[in-house]
Amino acid sequence: MKPSPRTPDFSPYLDFDRAQWRELRNSMPQVLTQKEVIELRGIGENIDLAEVAEVYLPLSRLIHLQVAARQQLTAATETFLGTSPSISVPFVIGVAGSVAVGKSTTARLLQVLLQRWNSHPRVDLVTTDGFLYPGAELIRRGLMSRKGFPESYDQRALLRFVTDVKSGKLEVNAPVYSHTAYDRVPGEFTTVRQPDILIVEGLNVLQTGPTLMVSDLFDFSVYVDARTEDIEKWYIDRFLKLRDTAFRRPGAHFSHYADMADPESIAVARELWQSINLPNLVENILPTRVRASLVLKKGSDHLVERVRMRKI
């Protein structure tokens, strides 16, 4: 029996609970192992094979169908114009959401799952972290305390990158960011070579503006959502785990936090959340949720409990 999503009157969304959404998997086989899922997890996340089967396999099926529809539309346009098939136009997916909500894990899972479809095996993933202005430039502009806010990104470079990929350019380079050094890696790039699908993951990728924005180039978009108080808890928990791991690496930008006791670490993390990440979420990220093609709503256990899909 097909699921019947709850659809509020005059809402542009179809609203599924987890049981309804998992039925849309439509007998798709599980293509990941537990080992692969563990490797794809973010810090502090509980994602397992059940989450993949019930949430991400249906989502990968939906995107697969949309990719096929986009290819048919391209073919129809070529028929109308009487032109020969041109270079395949990559299908571009945006993945947005707050810091610590799990959007990076969602993007990695989608990359791996979509690669398993024979019709679009080349799936590239780029994060917008590499398009943050270098640390020296942020200092020059007085933006170090606004890192992660829209103005801290080289929006022109990001737009040019996605435009070049979508236009079929043979090779396009994206800057690489180091979370250890908390800065771009000079001279290091990720090269994208005419993928079937490009996933662009970042805090502010769904933002709009008076001129063309990267979100205008997306064929599909996902917003990873959760209650603000849950995200704050996850952020603090992640900070404590990073204090014991990444902050201790040689050259770590945040090495001065590595030897803090729990009470002091929690106080620092809460201050960072309340002064930087929460304002960015409220002012810039959360307002873009309405633009997403699909919203994954997580519960306090970090697992998806509801899915909202745009009808139009």
Curated annotation (Swiss-Prot):
Disulfide bonds: none annotated. This is Pantothenate kinase. It comes from Corynebacterium glutamicum (strain ATCC 13032 / DSM 20300 / JCM 1318 / BCRC 11384 / CCUG 27702 / LMG 3730 / NBRC 12168 / NCIMB 10025 / NRRL B-2784 / 534). One of its GO terms (molecular function) is pantothenate kinase activity. It is found in: Cytoplasm. It catalyses: (R)-pantothenate + ATP = (R)-4'-phosphopantothenate + ADP + H(+). The keyword ATP-binding applies. ATP binds at G97, S98, V99, A100, V101, G102, K103, S104. Its EC number is 2.7.1.33. The keyword NAD does not apply. GO terms for cellular component: cytoplasm. GO terms for biological process: coenzyme A biosynthetic process. Keywords: ATP-binding, Coenzyme A biosynthesis, Cytoplasm, Kinase, Nucleotide-binding, Transferase. It is an enzyme of class 2 (transferase). HAMAP family: Pantothen_kinase_1. Pathway: Cofactor biosynthesis; coenzyme A biosynthesis; CoA from (R)-pantothenate: step 1/5. Belongs to the prokaryotic pantothenate kinase family. InterPro entries: P-loop_NTPase (IPR027417), PanK (IPR004566), PRK/URK (IPR006083).
